[in-house]
Amino acid sequence: MADIKVAAYICKGCGLGERLDTDALVKIAQKDGKVPLAKSHEFLCNADGVAMIKNDIANEGVTHVMIGACSRRAKTEAFFFPENAVARANLREGVIWIRPDTDEARETTQEMAEDYIRMGCAEVKAMTAPGGNPNTGSSKTLLVVGGGVTGMT
């Protein structure tokens, strides 16, 4: 099994940078998540952000990617890296959208985001990078079973 190298990327877009201390989240990923490479970006889902991740995959040997940004259901095309294990920490919908935007709630919101980063780092480390089974070949044929009218509607 090849060595794994984990990288964490924290997005500042979509209100994340205004509500959270993203530099502190980068430090949490490095210290508590034990991630050797952690960075933040203004908008991870734009071309520059995706290029930064792809560059690290190509040049730094990153095999596992943890993205702290929006929901794993959003921006799936932007964060599709077929050769790498990818985990998403849902900071937008899971943290800042459900917490009040008040001074009293700011500290607990930050703590919640830090927990999400810790969980994302732990999740991606437990993943196996996709690669298929090297012992079997691939096949382009498909068998459809039960393709009746009920299954088509």
Regions found by a protein language model. Give the residues of each.
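Residues forming the flavin
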Residues: 1-153
